[in-house]
Design a protein with these regions (language model features):
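A short glycine-rich, His/Asp/Glu-containing loop-to-beta-strand
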Residues: 80-119, 125
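Short histidine-centered beta-strand/loop micro-motifs
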Residues: 95-97, 117-123, 130, 149, ...
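Short beta-strand His + acidic residue motifs that chelate non-heme Fe in jelly-roll/DSBH
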Residues: 94, 118-120, 138-139, 166-169, ...
Length: 208
């Protein structure tokens, strides 16, 4: 496509079904063989992706990546933006942004001033928190007790949007995030290694 836009398109002719050197037709040097059913299925997934939040297979050279780029090019101006569905309560909001079957999901968390969220742990799920606006205290504590029967120590990180650092929520560690501001909302990008499944939330309450 880039070559065609630059006036450097690939050209060929045909003898029957065999492609030969020529000037009659433009062609794409990379081709994929897919059934009509496969193409229709992928186009349906692309169409629904704004609702499902799913990101298709974007592996280098994959047919899905090529078709996805072509699909997007057909959006008309004025249709590039779409709404998301925030889960809102008196603490703030939590909005899923992107979901992938193999690389988890990305969400945006907003916490009102002074609010603490979390105080739970996961068996297999792990997360990365990145504060992009505001200042937060993120605390983690290993679940269980040490050899003397005492709780494990709390590990605390104070992070802010002015000095971005990612903090990992490790499986088996209860964790919380607190907005340290009295006036400003805290905005955090949260990545989890697996999409949220309401049938198997893997979330267990325990105060840090």
């Amino acid at each position: 496509m880039l070559g065609a836009l630059l006036g450097e398109e690939h050209r060929c002719g045909y003898e029957g079904l065999e492609r030969v050197e020529g000037e009659d037709f433009c062609y794409v040097p990379q081709t994929d063989v897919k059934s009509l059913g496969e193409i229709v299925y992928l186009l349906g997934c692309f169409r629904d992706s704004r609702e499902t939040l799913s990101v298709p297979d974007l592996a280098e050279g994959s047919f899905s990546k090529k078709l996805w780029s072509t699909f997007l090019s057909y959006y008309e101006p004025g249709h590039f933006a779409y709404g998301l569905k925030p889960n809102v309560d008196d603490r703030g909001s939590f909005t899923e942004f992107l979901r992938t079957p193999e690389r988890g999901q990305v969400s945006i968390n907003v916490s009102k001033p002074g609010i603490t969220k979390g105080n739970h742990w996961h068996m297999s799920k792990w997360e990365r928190f990145l504060v992009v606006s505001g200042t937060a205290s993120i605390k983690l504590r290993k679940v269980g007790e040490d050899a003397e029967g005492n709780q494990f120590p709390v590990d605390e990180y104070v992070v802010s949007g002015s000095d971005m650092r990612a903090v990992e929520m490790i499986p088996g560690y209860t964790h919380s995030i607190t907005n340290l501001s009295d006036t400003e909302d805290l905005v955090t990008v949260m990545w989890a290694n697996e999409p949220f499944d309401p049938e198997n939330p893997d979330t267990y309450y325990e105060e840090v």
